[in-house]
């Protein structure tokens, strides 16, 4: 959604708003790209809440799948998003979960710390 959107009763006009398929654990800005990393978001919360209210027991499978993603059983996703348009420029599947707020960008490199205690350095394109 582009231009002047007001979400959730906020008095702040947004330049753009996009849902992303990631539960953000880390974000970092590098020039005109924001990098977002985290486990995949596999659940539509509004739909799930409606199913819970309707006492639909099949919703438990969806909740379990989202919990498995949060636990790291599905790795994580790294998105590169344009700050100008909100468009996803690229998507990378990572085999590990980043730590909370564990991303940094410097000199064309992106650094991610993981829950396994490692640091990964990704080199940017020129």
Predicted regions and their residues:
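Extracytoplasmic/lumenal domain signature
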Residues: 1-126
């Amino acid at each position: 959604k582009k231009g002047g959107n007001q979400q959730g009763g906020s008095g702040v006009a947004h330049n753009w708003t996009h849902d992303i398929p990631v539960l953000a654990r880390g974000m970092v800005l590098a020039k005109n790209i924001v990098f977002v990393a985290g486990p995949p978001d596999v659940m539509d919360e509004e739909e799930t809440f409606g199913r819970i209210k309707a006492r639909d027991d099949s919703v438990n499978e969806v909740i379990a799948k989202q919990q498995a993603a949060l636990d790291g059983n599905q790795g994580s996703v790294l998105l590169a998003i344009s700050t100008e348009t909100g468009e996803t420029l690229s998507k990378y599947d990572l085999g590990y979960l980043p730590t909370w707020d564990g991303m940094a960008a410097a000199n064309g490199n992106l650094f991610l710390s993981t829950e396994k205690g490692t640091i990964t350095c990704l080199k940017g394109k020129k």
